[in-house]
């Protein structure tokens, strides 16, 4: 019998599959093992009575604060100076975790704390790797290792530990952490360590906002590239930072009991986990130090459930958040998530709990782990190879008509490159350039060089179209076309007409969401200031959003070719100043990306964007991989444009996929030119898709090409041999990976689903298990 509001008991919680992401080796040793090892190694302890020793080690009663909490580590570390002891404790931690229902465990420790008796860092690492291997051979658990640097030690030590993390990446070391006191020991001091971490694409989590303020967390994210935040209590001090963590999907490792015991909060109910969860943040319930806190992960779930009134569906989501936030490889992660979800749901269902909330939130589970909750319940939550059961066997043929009628989003439409050829010709006619040779020559004098004017031979619309949309564009003709279009977009009237044309064409292409890229400096030849240009664009955006179904985001951009660092900084300030008027990001584009050596000249711009948690998209990876790495980690880009060379390093492609870093791409001459080596066995777009990179197809400068968005998609689909399911994913990506807030992205994806189903139903196309 199903009971509403039935108590979620500790026994039930123990049965649930769980992942633990924040557990310290030297803080989770059994008291009995501590005693045995001390006797074996002749280590002096204050007492050898197990009960009395437990009173010293456990901090669940009368802990006066962090200093008192840390005192116990002197005893645990003293017996962990020999390889066999380290191996044993790692194994026993896994054993204890399994007894508590934990099926995935990340154990963190600092190897440097285990070298007092002569072990090298490598010997310490071999010892934990042995413990992990033995555990996985004998226990139903997956375990991994996180190596900790220490803030208060010399940065050179952290550098060595970062290097050892990289060297043991294939033996189970999956991430680097920075632990230790925050105040007075900024993570910025350890830049050499994080340079290694970033350049090698190593996962990264930092203890931040535990015993310090929100700036420590901001430093961890913006300067160190943290993929997760350990503790993060201080995030609540800054709403803008919290929104950034939510929107960037940066998980927070929440250690409720530990935070209470060190007096970071006065009681468990003051922990911000519920606030974070309700704000849309990804939170993971963790133990920190099981022995010192005298807790289990099941107990921490029980504490959170009872204190913050988490319901069945929320508990299942908390469980999934932890598995989703793990640093394990993506193919294994997604399958662990699916099986853990099914197991948890079945436990609640068979024990009489109301699971209607899970069905109500089926959108989350379908989009996140690809499971149709209702279908899984119908199939009795089969655990073995159930994914794909009842899925369409015969996908519909992908036709141009199908693509024309499905909803789309475009995340990179250039204002001076997205105007239709008809509207551009209209501006030519309004200036009389088509009728008067003198007017034409006066117009062409405004081009940047006389050499370019030599190519501008057109007498009528047909010749003009052949010039602007040449089937054999060269760098010269592309440059000429861009300059001609730009010269025709200099007055308020021209800007207004161009905006109207761009939106009308987008609506015709069934575009529901558009990110319009605008470089205000490009439209100031006739005396308009960049502020006036942007004000015109914002006014037009507001007008169209009120009068039509389209939603528009504005991205101010700078040219790495034409703008110097001072002009780029000025444009970034303009973008941020208008963030409440629809400007949602900043971009840097050009003929060539900013190289790693040049990026320091733009450091003020990058720092400003980071300080304001402002989205950045940047052109990178044209002909080198280095610019991709510096663009992600030094510039702080949340989206990449181009990324033509990412396929050369499979680990980099995996990184883009694992951290959902979207790649803007289109059928441009640049794509063909800089990915020619990739075409021998696949297409560049298919290569990125198969690597699980969130590819977003964009129109860029559609004025230069004679096909609509739908025709561009059709070419891509045919060249890459995509099936219906892959096409749906490709179309959905820009709805899910744009610069809007997390909640708005959810709403956009739901809009895509709704409109897609309406059309597919009208033509009797089955979309089971593809769209929900």
UniProtKB/Swiss-Prot annotation:
The active site is at residue 210. Substrate binds at residues 24, 26, 180. Disulfide bonds: none annotated. Keywords: Hydrolase, Metal-binding, Nucleotide metabolism, Zinc. Zn(2+) binds at residues 22, 24, 207, 288. One of its GO terms (molecular function) is metal ion binding. GO terms for cellular component: cytosol; external side of plasma membrane. The record marks 231 as: Important for catalytic activity. Its EC number is 3.5.4.4. Binds 1 zinc ion per subunit. The keyword Ubl conjugation does not apply. It catalyses: adenosine + H2O + H(+) = inosine + NH4(+). InterPro entries: A_deaminase_dom (IPR001365), Ado/ade_deaminase (IPR006330), Metal_Hydrolase (IPR032466). Belongs to the metallo-dependent hydrolases superfamily. Adenosine and AMP deaminases family. Catalyzes the hydrolytic deamination of adenosine. Plays an important role in purine metabolism and in adenosine homeostasis, and may thereby contribute to cellular signaling events. This is Probable adenosine deaminase.
